[in-house]
């Protein structure tokens, strides 16, 4: 088990991996559907969602279906029906799951481990409990000061014992002072 603060760096600035993945997908969908000129001046996530749901039409619905069919978990949900807004939320979650898995794999390559896959070659890694932790405002950051955390659970295979020992004792990623990056390891079986 691992609670981590996954971040991505763009143009020298660190961004929350989850929020970045969602924003990237929404921007891509708006661009693919040629709706960029319809965006309001304040381009928050809710504005993208509203625009896509109101003006995306059948092309948007079809694109969400394509995104969801790639992931077995969400393809199963797709068979249950649901509203277009549900499909958008599932597509965002599928995108986040994929992004977090890539982040975790990248950490493992650097730190001597990899997630174990099942018989269908799907990772046994699960993520849950995404949270935003607000910190008291210092330095003029206002209410945006804080960090996010995600809990990972799954099976690992150690690929480099020395690197893994270092990760086990030092931790993974950022926000270790806030309890992130600490591995809880148990023997399988």
Enumerate the language-model features and the residues they cover.
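RNA-interacting cores
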Residues: 1-189
């Amino acid at each position: 088990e691992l609670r981590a603060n996954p971040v991505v760096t763009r143009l020298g600035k660190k961004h929350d991996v989850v929020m970045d993945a969602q924003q990237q997908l929404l921007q891509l969908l708006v661009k693919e559907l040629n709706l960029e000129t319809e965006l309001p001046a304040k381009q928050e996530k809710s504005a993208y969602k509203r625009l896509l749901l109101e003006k995306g039409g059948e092309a948007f619905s079809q694109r969400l279906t394509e995104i969801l069919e790639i992931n077995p978990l969400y393809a199963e949900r797709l068979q249950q029906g649901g509203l277009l807004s549900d499909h958008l939320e599932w597509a965002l979650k599928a995108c986040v799951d994929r992004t977090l898995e890539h982040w975790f794999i990248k950490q493992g390559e650097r730190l001597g481990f990899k997630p174990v896959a099942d018989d269908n070659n799907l990772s046994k890694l699960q993520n849950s409990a995404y949270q935003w932790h607000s910190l008291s405002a210092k330095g003029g950051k206002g209410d945006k000061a804080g960090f996010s955390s995600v809990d990972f659970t799954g099976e690992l295979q150690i690929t480099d014992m020395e690197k893994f020992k270092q990760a086990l004792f030092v931790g993974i990623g950022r926000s270790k002072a806030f309890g992130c990056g600490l591995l809880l390891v148990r023997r399988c079986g």
